[in-house]
Structures are given as C-alpha cells and as structure tokens.
C-alpha cells in the first residue's frame, strides 16, 4: 500500500512534457510577438498561427503543424476562450505558478475525442476562412496584373501608331474622313428612323379618321325610315298597329284599322276592323280619262290584333266606284 501511494504521488508531481514546453514558449519574452500571456495572465495568445508554426513549433516539437498543437491543448484540458483570436486557457496554467502545472493531466480518451472533434470543426472553419481570404487576394493580384499589362501596352501601341503615321502621312486625314463619314451615315440612319416613325404615326391617324368616317356614315344610314316610324307607331299605338303593304306604284289605297278590345265577361279574344277605301283617278295610275279603271297598284295598311295571339285577316274586296268613295256605304 505504501508503494502504491508513493507511485501516485510521484505521478502527480510529474509534469507532462507538452505542458512544460508550452509554458516555456509562453513565458519566453523574446517570442511575445508570436505567443504571449493574456491580459489577466491566466491564458495565452497565439498572435500569428502561421509564423508561430514555422518559427516556434519546430524549436520545441518535432513538427510544425498548428492543428496538432491545438489538438494537444484540447487533450490536456485547454479551451479556446475568444472566438476572434487564438487564445487558450486552463485553470492550472497561470503565469508565475509553475507548481500548479502538475495538476494538468491528460484527459480520458472519450472526452479527448469529443473535444478534439469540436476543435477540429473550429480549425476547419478557420482554414476555410483563410482559403477565402487567399482567393480574394489572388483575384486582386490578377486584376492588378491586368491593369499593369494594359498600362505597359499603351506606350507600345502609341509608338506603333506614330510609326505608321510617319510612314503614311495621309493616315490621319483618312481616319478623320472615315470618322466623319461614319458620323454622317449615323445621322442619315437616324433621320430615316424618324421619318419611318412619323409616317407610321400618320398612317395610324388616317386609319383612325377613316374609322370615324365609317362610323359616321353608318350612323347616318341608320336614320329612322317611314317604315320604322310606322313600326314605332304600331308598337306604341293604343289602338293597334298599322302594317303597310305596297303593291304597285300607284293605285287605290286600302286602309284597315283593327282595334284591340277585350270583353270583361269572356276569356276569348275578339277583333274588330274598320276599313276605309278610296280610289285615285285613272290618270294617276297612268290612264287617260277621268273615270276609274282597273286597279294597277295597291297599298294596304292592315292592322289585326287578338287577345292571346295574332290572327292574320284577309283584306276585304274593294267595292266598285263610286261606292268606294263612301267607304263601303252611302
């Protein structure tokens, strides 16, 4: 039992070589521009990871891999305390208190793997950010190179142009004439475009005027005719309607007027007609005497109305002259 306790005490007093080397790196004032203590002296900061990996790590370890160094810190319980910079801390890693370093022990495998995964994720994100910055810098360098090349080519182009002018003195006048000709052609093209536009507008205005003229003629031609007037009278007449029927150019005229009526004691419809007939002299129809001959033409006004439907009635036979003057009576 005593031997076991002494072994445990010896193990507790032994400081891990990694912790010793890390403390020496941080505590060395000559390397403060790469790695130094934090403001509260309970953490340390890696100022420039790239230079730190190339200059400091090979002097203390057998590698120059910053990711491996960070992974080792996580294994011994160090944590990153500032997301914007590489600052690490451990409760037993304090400035001027080396006796506390023996309390920093290596973590178990499970916890170490968990912390390692977290730190690996942070390292991957940092690497991606650095790669993005590198791509931006490379793109800027390419743009600067193109500008430099263009600037270098300008004197060469100017010298080549001057050489051509010396060899051919008429080069400048020809270039000026060509430029003037191109300008005139452009002006002519612009004028043609304006003319086409104006002609298009005029044609559209003429089409609109023609459409308005057609509408006016249609409205003029749709003026009510006598037949439409009679139809209007027929539709609005209180007694009935008059339907004109024309046969021949001149002749006798038969006017019939049928009035609508209803009987209060019957549901059947009745119709009554009042017929008046008058004849024109034969001379009007193209004859030569004062008497009245056969009827050459006839115009009839007929009106028939029934209650419950329309029944067309046959026109009455025209009585001979002179009875026609008395409308069928004396």
Swiss-Prot record:
UniProt-recorded Gene Ontology molecular function terms: DNA-binding transcription factor activity; sequence-specific DNA binding
PANTHER family xref list: HEAT SHOCK TRANSCRIPTION FACTOR, HEAT STRESS TRANSCRIPTION FACTOR C-1
Region annotation (Disordered) ranges: 180-235, 268-291
Cellular component aspect of the GO annotation: nucleus
Top-level division of the source organism's lineage: Eukaryota
Region called Hydrophobic repeat HR-A/B, residue ranges: 114-166
Record-annotated DNA-binding residue ranges: 15-109
Motif (Nuclear localization signal): 191-195
Keyword Transcription belongs to the record: yes
Modification comment: Exhibits temperature-dependent phosphorylation.
Cross-referenced Pfam families: HSF_DNA-bind
Subcellular location: Nucleus
Protein name: Heat stress transcription factor C-1
Keywords recorded for this protein, A-Z: DNA-binding, Nucleus, Phosphoprotein, Stress response, Transcription, Transcription regulation
Biased composition (Low complexity): 220-229, 268-280
Domain observations: The hydrophobic-rich region (HR-A/B) corresponds to the oligomerization domain.
Subunit composition and interactions: Homotrimer.
Function: Transcriptional regulator that specifically binds DNA sequence 5'-AGAAnnTTCT-3' known as heat shock promoter elements (HSE).
Family: Belongs to the HSF family. Class C subfamily.
Record flagged with keyword Nucleotide-binding: no
